[in-house]
């Protein structure tokens, strides 16, 4: 039995802190709380009306995937991780993660509601798990892992792949729109959400390091490469990024680059050994690393939650 999963009679009381690294992650999550009301999407409609039909199609489908996926992540947290993990510090993090995933889902739903006026099309997008085969494939993979009989360690990797790999290409595609100066509300919310998901991914890596009997490197590689191929197909075949003027081969490479960052953070050898083909993603990740806890708006932080000495925190995964 893993210590973090062993019955813990002290789980109802937070102090004394036993796992300081996990507690620090919780405090970082707490410091970065935000709400949809902080994002101004009023200026997006002008840009939206100027987009080509292909660009609109792409954005709507990406938002439809995102709107559903946060709910799947939360179902896993509620049904599995929150009941399995017995240490208080991790339960604090998971509880906070559930709250912020709800905010992500609300944000994506609000964006769809703002951009799409036709009620039938809205329903189609809000029910993407049933209505869109390309979204259903990713959702099915994630849902399969909620109910899988595999141990906590394997499922931890699978959901790190969901948040670290399944979201990566879509985040990059929205940052591409930012590079073009389009859709300030969408791109600002994307910054906030990608930052949150980076922290969730880092937390999964931290929990993995607390396992005494983690899954084998072979198992980890299998799960990650599986997620990579599904994400590559999603953004180069089902919903090709060429619709918004991005290069599909570069997107494939970018997803491999992200997967290498994740598997390295888990303590294993890289699989693909590729460099980041998107210079604009390098700049964004560096910005986030240097300013993460210095500004409230854009690089948000609740005042006074974190002390000054914690300002050096950097995201190990690119979002």
Swiss-Prot record:
Its EC number is 1.17.4.1. Interacts with RNR1/OPG080 subunit. Can interact with host RNR1 supunit. One of its GO terms (molecular function) is metal ion binding. It catalyses: a 2'-deoxyribonucleoside 5'-diphosphate + [thioredoxin]-disulfide + H2O = a ribonucleoside 5'-diphosphate + [thioredoxin]-dithiol. Residues 313-319 are annotated as: Interaction with R1. The keyword Amino-acid biosynthesis does not apply. PANTHER family: RIBONUCLEOSIDE-DIPHOSPHATE REDUCTASE SMALL CHAIN, RIBONUCLEOSIDE-DIPHOSPHATE REDUCTASE SUBUNIT M2. One of its GO terms (biological process) is deoxyribonucleotide biosynthetic process. Its cofactor is Fe cation. Ribonucleoside-diphosphate reductase holoenzyme provides the precursors necessary for viral DNA synthesis. Allows virus growth in non-dividing cells. Catalyzes the biosynthesis of deoxyribonucleotides from the corresponding ribonucleotides. Belongs to the ribonucleoside diphosphate reductase small chain family. Signal peptide: none annotated. This is Ribonucleoside-diphosphate reductase small chain. InterPro entries: Ferritin-like_SF, RNR-like, RNR_small, RNR_small_AS, RNR_small_fam. Binds 2 iron ions per subunit. It is an enzyme of class 1 (oxidoreductase). Keywords: Deoxyribonucleotide synthesis, Early protein, Iron, Metal-binding, Oxidoreductase.
């Amino acid at each position: 039995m893993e210590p973090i999963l062993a019955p813990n009679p002290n789980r109802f009381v937070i102090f004394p802190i036993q796992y300081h690294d996990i507690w620090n992650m919780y405090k970082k999550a707490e410091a970065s709380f935000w709400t949809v009301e902080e994002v101004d999407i009023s200026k997006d409609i002008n840009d939206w009306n100027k987009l080509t039909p292909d660009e609109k199609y792409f954005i709507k489908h990406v938002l439809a995937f995102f709107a559903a996926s946060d709910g799947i992540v939360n179902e896993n947290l509620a049904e599995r991780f929150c009941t399995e993990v017995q240490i208080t510090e991790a339960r604090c993090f998971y509880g906070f993660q559930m709250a912020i995933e709800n905010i992500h889902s609300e944000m994506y739903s609000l964006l769809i509601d703002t951009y799409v006026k036709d009620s039938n099309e809205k329903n189609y997008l809000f029910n993407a798990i049933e209505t869109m085969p390309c979204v259903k494939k990713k959702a099915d993979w994630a849902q399969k892992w909620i109910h899988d009989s595999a141990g906590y360690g394997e499922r931890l990797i699978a959901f790190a792949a969901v948040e670290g790999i399944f979201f990566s290409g879509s985040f990059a595609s929205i940052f591409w729109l930012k590079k073009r100066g389009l859709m300030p509300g969408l791109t600002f919310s994307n910054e906030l959400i990608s930052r949150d998901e980076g922290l969730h991914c880092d937390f999964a890596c931290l929990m993995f390091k607390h396992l005494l009997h983690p899954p084998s490197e072979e198992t980890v590689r299998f799960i990650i490469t599986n997620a990579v191929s599904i994400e590559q197909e999603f953004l180069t075949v089902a919903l090709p990024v060429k619709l918004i003027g991005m290069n599909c081969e570069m997107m494939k490479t970018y997803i491999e680059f992200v997967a290498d960052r994740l598997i390295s953070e888990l303590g294993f050898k890289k699989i693909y050994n590729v460099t980041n083909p998107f210079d604009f993603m390098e700049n964004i990740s560096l910005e986030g690393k240097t300013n993460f806890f210095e500004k409230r708006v854009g690089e948000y932080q609740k005042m006074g939650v974190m002390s000054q000495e914690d300002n050096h925190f950097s995201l190990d995964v690119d979002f």
